[in-house]
Amino acid sequence: LTATQQIIKQAEGMTLEELAQKAIEESNGKTFYGVGNSSRGKAALPLFIEYLQSIDPSYSMEFDWQQPKNNKIFEQLTADSLKPEGTFAMTLIQDGNQIESKMTQTGILDTFIPKEWAEANGTTPDAVDGYLALQTLNKVFEYNCTGSKVYDNCWDFVAEDTHALFMDIDSEVVGKNFLYMLTEDKYAAMLKDAFNALPADEQAYFQPTIDEMESEANDLGLGADGKYALAWIKLWVGSYNAQTDDGPICNTLVSDSATDQCGLLVYSKLRSVEESAGVSVNNIKVAAY
């Protein structure tokens, strides 16, 4: 075991309070450096400090939270791992696929399973295969319903002159993974069925792109309906309105002035909307999960 893995092994045999005592010893009066592609880590740190102060009122800790854009977090952590002593005490990463390929398979991050969690689930840390997810979030298609337009088919989001608000695929790889997912036979078949449910005039707009993608789908070894998936992906990537984060997307869509606009975003963002004369969650409808 590496030195880090030995520490993890010790920690997996400790209760939460024992871990907290250890954290107090290690960090009291120091600065805690964290990095993540979500602000949730920064929001959690004051609560962490508050918890440790409930055990030791004299405890204090400063913190510095970095939130790199454009998926730079993996490069940052890789560089940090090459130092004799790393800077970051914590990371929060949203993309399980890349954590596996870029962080754990490379030996940069190791898995920690809390003793009390394992006991509550009738297992032991050694027996747990995989990772503990902090949370699973649903990204949903939403649209502003202050007008007469209705989005009742997934092809509506890539229709002519429609520019859905979407966190750019180079900023958050979850969105890119969603597009890859559509090429799976199950989802490609759903896209075909949705296309067949469209009126003839709308089908006529999409058909040339679908036909264009047929050879591409064959070259990629996709299933019989792969051309529908590639067509939707091509139209989506060519039309979406790139945004830096889901928060601004939500703020735009809930406004009275965003009539008929649509977007793909985390559903939980609606919780932070403050109702006012021109802003309301009632201006939003969820079109599809």
Regions found by a protein language model. Give the residues of each.
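N-terminal low-complexity, Pro/Thr/Ser-rich intrinsically disordered segments
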Residues: L1-S27, I210
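Short, polar/charged alpha-helical segment
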Residues: L16-N28, S38-S60, F141, V273-E275
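CheY-like receiver
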Residues: K22, Q76-D80, T252, D256
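Extracytoplasmic ligand-binding site segments that recognize negatively charged/polar headgroups
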Residues: K30-E50, F63-T78, G86-C250
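Short helix-terminating capping/connector loops at secondary-structure junctions
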Residues: S58-S60, E85-F88, V279-N282
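Generic structural signal for residues in well-ordered beta-strands
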Residues: M61-W65, I284-V286
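Periplasmic binding protein-like
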Residues: D80-M90, S257-C262
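Extracytoplasmic/periplasmic substrate-binding proteins
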Residues: A224-L230, V237-Y289
